[in-house]
Amino acid sequence: EGFRESGLSLEQSKALIQLGVELADKARNDFLTENPDGKAYVAASIGPYGAYLADGSEYRGNYRASPETIREFHTGRIEAIRELAEQFDFWAVETLPSLDEALIVADLLAADPHPAWFSFTLKDEEHIPEGMSLAEVTRALDEIPSVTAIGINCCHPGWVMDMRILSTGCISA
């Protein structure tokens, strides 16, 4: 959507999204050529709908958008990246402010063979911006087979250790 609003066509927008994956894959291959015993992975990054709005709402979660609008926003980007399935290793769904948005993206990725991690912003030591506790978020996402990791980002550094404590007992083995 952001590319489209900048005057690019749908095809140009798709090409730019895919270029990010292609450049990351090339960087990985260059690294592995120079470091044959090394390991390198490419994450296909999916950011929040609020980042497109460019109003800071990715940190608040108050998009005032319908679930259908959020689904449509993520669908096009995911489909563009999915065409390059051989060039990335996992999905990194990052900086989400709400469980609702995470569940929409998880549903879109449900049939995808790549594992996915989901990370959230926090409004305080225990809650994501929409108000749900991190423990509740962890329990909800733990039910989804493709979700392999849950984390936090873009938050106060002191809250990172608290997340480990809060999520203890919420994740299945």
List where the protein language model places each region:
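Domain-level signal for soluble alpha/beta catalytic cores
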Residues: 1-173
